[in-house]
C-alpha cells in the first residue's frame, strides 16, 4: 500500500514520538522532509536531525526530539495543506501562530521557509503545517 501523504505521516510520527517520550525517531527520507526538519531544528523545536543511508539502502531520516523539564517542546504540530485540499496564502494573509510563539512552515517559490521569513521576503505560498 502506498503512502498518500508522507508529510502528514512525518508530523504524526513526531507527535506520537513525543507523546511516548522517545528521544529518536526514524522515518523514510525525502528532500521536503529534510527541509522541514532543518526548519524545526533552526527554530529550536528539535535537537538535531541526520540523514543516513547509502546508494543501496534507502535514506533514513533520524530526528532527535527535544524536551524541556520533562515536557515536549512541540505542544502542537498540525498539517494544514494536504493533497486533497491545498491551502495557499498571499504574503499579506500569512498566519501568525500564537502571536509569534509558533511557526507556520510555508512552501514558496524560493523554497521551504517559516512564515516570518516568507513575510520578510514578501512571498506567499502553500502552508504545509503549523508548529507551536
UniProtKB/Swiss-Prot annotation:
Does Manganese count among this protein's keywords? no
Give the keywords, sorted: Ribonucleoprotein, Ribosomal protein, RNA-binding, rRNA-binding
MF annotations from Gene Ontology: rRNA binding; structural constituent of ribosome
Q: Write down a Pfam family by its short name.
A: Ribosomal_S8
**InterPro entries given in the database record:** Ribosomal_uS8 (IPR000630), Ribosomal_uS8_CS (IPR047863), Ribosomal_uS8_sf (IPR035987)
Task: Please indicate if the UniProt record lists Ribonucleoprotein as a keyword.
Answer: yes
**GO aspect biological process, one term:** translation
How does it associate, per the subunit comment?
Part of the 30S ribosomal subunit. Contacts proteins S5 and S12.
State its role.
Answer: One of the primary rRNA binding proteins, it binds directly to 16S rRNA central domain where it helps coordinate assembly of the platform of the 30S subunit.
Q: What family does this belong to?
A: Belongs to the universal ribosomal protein uS8 family.
The record, for NCBIfam families, names: PRK00136.1
- Would you tell me the protein name for this molecule? Small ribosomal subunit protein uS8
Organism from which the protein derives: Baumannia cicadellinicola subsp. Homalodisca coagulata
Gene (UniProt): rpsH
Amino acid at each position: 500500500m502506498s503512502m498518500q501523504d508522507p508529510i502528514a505521516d512525518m508530523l504524526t510520527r513526531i507527535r506520537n514520538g513525543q507523546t511516548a517520550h522517545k528521544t529518536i525517531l526514524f522515518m523514510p527520507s525525502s528532500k521536503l522532509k529534510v527541509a522541514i526538519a532543518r526548519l524545526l531544528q533552526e527554530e529550536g523545536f528539535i535537537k538535531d536531525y541526520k540523514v543516513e543511508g547509502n546508494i543501496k539502502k534507502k535514506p533514513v531520516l533520524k530526528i532527535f526530539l527535544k524536551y524541556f523539564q520533562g515536557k515536549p517542546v512541540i505542544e502542537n504540530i498540525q498539517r494544514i495543506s494536504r493533497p486533497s485540499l491545498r491551502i495557499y496564502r498571499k504574503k499579506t494573509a500569512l498566519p501568525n501562530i500564537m502571536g509569534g510563539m509558533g511557526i507556520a512552515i510555508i512552501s514558496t517559490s524560493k523554497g521551504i521557509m517559516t512564515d516570518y521569513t516568507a513575510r520578510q521576503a514578501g512571498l506567499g505560498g502553500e502552508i504545509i503545517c503549523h508548529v507551536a
